[in-house]
Amino acid sequence: MLKPLALLLVLAGSQCAPLGDLYLPDDDVEILTIENFKRYVENSTSAWLVEFYASWCGYCQRFAPPWKQFATEAAPWRDLVRVAVLECSDEINTPICRDFGIVKYPTVRYFHENSHFDGGDKGVIVPREFPVTVDAIKKNVIERFMTEMGEGRGVVYPNLLPYLHSDLEPFFDEEDDDIFYGFLVVEDSDSYLGGEVALDLHKTPNVTIRHALNNNTKLVKNLQIGKFPTLVIIDRNNNTQIVTENIEHKKELKATIADYLAKKGLKVCETTPEKKGHLSLDPHPDPKQRSRTLLRQKIKKMGDAVFQMDLETSLRYALLREVSTTKVIKGEQLAALRAFLNVIKKYFPFGYNSTSFINNLTNLTSSDEVQGVQVQVLVQQADDSGVFSTPQRFLGCQGSANRFRGYPCSLWRLFHYLTVNSVLLNVSNRKANPVEVLGAMHGYVKHFFSCSHCSEHFQKMAAERNLTSVSSLEESVLWLWEAHNVVNKRLKGDTTEDPEYPKEQFPTRLRCPECYGEDGTWRKKEVLKYLKRMYGRYSVRYVGSDTKVLFPGLDR
C-alpha cells in the first residue's frame, strides 16, 4: 500500500514542463508553439515580433506585463506586425529555440514580412533594457521598423523615416494622388511620437503622417518652430497650419488630427484586426489542484529537506532545456560544460545504472565541438534506460504557481549539494581544488543559465565576492550559502517572489537556533554543520523515487 505522501504524489499528477502562466489566450499576444510557429511566421504578409521566454525566469516575469501592454497598445498595427510569445521552457519547443539560437531569456526577435527560414532568415534581435517599460519597448521596436525601411524592407509600414527636406514644397512628391492631407510631427531626436501615431492611424484614407526631427535645423528655422513636439498640417494646395498646444501625448495628438479631418468630412480609421488564434482555455477546474496543494503543504512541513526528485529534475532540465538548446557548443562554452559534467560525475547522487550515461556525456565533450542535440539524445536515452529514479517534476521546489521556484530553486539546491559533497568526499584529499564546484557553477551560469538578468547578477556577485579567492572546500560551501542569502535579500518582496514561500535568510532561527549568536550574527561553524547535515548524501529524501534504481540490492 502506498504511504500517504506517495499517494498524494500520484494524485497530484506529473507537472514536468507545465504550460507557463505568464501569458494567457485572453492577452493581446499570439501564443506560438512548435506546431504553429512556422505556419504563422514564415512567408507571412505581416512582420512578427516574437518573445522567446521561460516562465520560471525572473526577468521574463518582469518583462511580461509591459510586453502584454505593448501588444495591447500596438493592436491597431496587427495587420502590419504581430506580437507573439513562445515558451522555450516547454520541452516540445526546444527544437525551435535551438534552431533560432535562443540561449538567453527573454529574447525578442523581429521577423520581417515574407521571411524564409530555409533561406537563413533567423530574425533580428530587438534590444531590451532593464528596467523594462512599455515606452522602451516601443522605442526599440519603432527603431527596428525604421531600420527595416532604410534597408529596403518594411514595405508594409507607413513611411516612418524622418522627413529630411528643409521646407514643405516636396512634401507630397512621393505620395499617391489620393493623399490629400499631410501631418508632420516635428519632435525631439529621441522621440517616437510621430512614428507611433503614423502606425496607429495607418489605415486612415487620404492621409499621410510623417515625422521630422528637431536636428533638421533648416526646416525648424523655415517653419519658425520653437517648441517640440509641433504638428504641421498641410494640404495639396500648400495651405499650412501649425499646432503647438495639446499634442504632447499620443492621445492628444490623435484627437487633434481627428478633429481636423472631421472638419474635412473624413474620419480616422483605427480598427484592430482579429488575432490569429490561441490555445484554448480549459473552462473546467483542474481536478488535481487540491492534491497538489495538499502535497506542497506536506512537503513544506518536512522542513529543510533535499529531495532526489529535485536534484534529478534540475540536472535533466539543465541538460535538456539549456545545454541542448545551444546549437553548437565550443570554446569557452565547451570548457564550461566539461567542468560542469566533471563535478556531476564526481558528486551527483546517481544510481548504479549511471556509469555509461555519464561516461558517454564526458566522452562526447572531449571533441572540439558538440551539437546541442547530441546532448539531448543522450539524456533522453538515459531516461528510457532507467538511469534516473524519478519522474521529471519538482517536489520540494514546486511553487504555488508554475512561474514560481521550480528550476532556479532546484539549481541552487543542486550546487549546494555538490559543494557539500565535495567536502565530504575529499576529506583525505589535500590536493582537492577548493573552487572546483564554484568554478563549474560560475561557468554554467555564465554560458548556459538562460535567464539573462539572473546570469548577469550572479557573474557580478562572483566578481564582487571574490569567488576565485576561496581557499578551502569548506569555505566554498559557506561562500555559496552567503551568496544565496544575498540573492534572497535582494529578491525579498520582489514580484518574482512566491507568496507561499517568502524569501528569508537561511537557515531560519526556527530551523537552526544554534546558527545565530546572541546579537543575531551568524555562527558560521554551526551553519557549516547544518549545511553538511542537510545536503549530505545520506540526508537526501527519496519521496517519489524508485529506490531500486538507486539501490539495486533492495529488490532482492
Locate the predicted segments by residue.
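Long, low-complexity intrinsically disordered regions in eukaryotic proteins
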Residues: 177-179, 203, 218, 222-225, ...
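Local sequence-structure signature of Cys/Sec-based thiol-disulfide redox active-site neighborhoods
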Residues: 35-74, 164-203, 434, 438-448
